[in-house]
Design a protein with these regions (language model features):
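Radical SAM/AdoMet-radical enzyme domain recognition
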Residues: 1-94
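Auxiliary Fe-S-binding modules of radical SAM enzymes
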Residues: 84-88, 98-233
Length: 233
């Protein structure tokens, strides 16, 4: 079981999450600079969050992944901070290319940066890409013999990014999205509310033939998703 979180109350919830069977945690950290972190999140909690992360790593077997949006203004500085952070920690930090949605077009065109910059740096400095498992997510992960942790890249604008997509998204309203950027959603709330596993499986299987082959981000079509926080991705 995996949870995505901003880590704001990590210490408070960690014990309960362990009891519930949590085995993977994804936390968003878009900057390791406390000032920039506060500007982005509105909370001056980065030192506490990093301390809580170290406690999690020292006291649990939970697999931890950190995510950050790749922004043009901070890309290189953030990469240097990430390299220091994963040096001795069993953590994968994933850079995610900034994706356009209907509410961020101006910021997107000002700050979008290709993941190729990160990839080139890693390959030039002895990092090696890892083979993806068939059930893995969209990140390409890189490892280095001198580092305990790893660095990942999620590049939705890269060619063939959608070819191996194995993801469905379910919103808190019980709507299935076959793609983060599609133009429709499908209601499965009744199956979830009633614990109807067979009905849910049948419904999901019936949707597979119409799952889009690819998104249309390069055509500036981000679908119905006004903001990625609506779906948690």
């Amino acid at each position: 079981m995996a949870v995505s979180s901003n880590g704001y109350r990590l210490a408070k919830h960690l014990s309960a999450w362990q009891t519930a069977g949590l085995n993977q945690l994804n936390i968003s950290i878009d900057s390791f600079d406390p000032t920039i972190f506060k500007q982005i999140t509105g909370f001056d909690i980065l030192p506490t969050l990093l301390q809580d992360i170290d406690t999690l790593l020292a006291t649990t077997d939970i697999k931890l992944k950190l995510n950050g949006i790749l922004m043009a203004d901070t890309a290189f500085d953030n990469l240097q901070s990430v390299l220091g952070f994963v040096k001795n920690r069993p953590v994968t930090y994933r850079f995610i290319e900034f994706m356009q949605t209907s509410d961020n077009k101006a910021l997107f065109f000002a700050q979008h940066s290709s993941g190729q910059l990160i990839k080139d740096f890693l390959l030039e400095n002895g990092w090696q890409s890892q083979r993806r498992a068939s059930d893995a997510g969209p990140a390409i992960e890189y490892r280095h013999a001198d580092y305990v942790g790893g660095i990942g890249l999620i590049e939705p604008y890269a060619p063939q990014f959608c070819d191996s997509c194995n993801r469905l998204r379910v919103s808190s309203q019980g709507k299935v999205h076959l793609c983060l950027f599609d133009n429709g959603s499908y209601d499965v709330r009744g199956f979830l509310a009633n614990g109807d596993v067979d009905g849910l499986v049948h419904a999901l299987q019936s949707l597979m033939p119409i799952k889009p082959e690819h998104h249309l981000l390069k055509q500036n079509d981000s679908g119905i998703m006004a903001n990625l926080s609506m779906i948690g991705g």
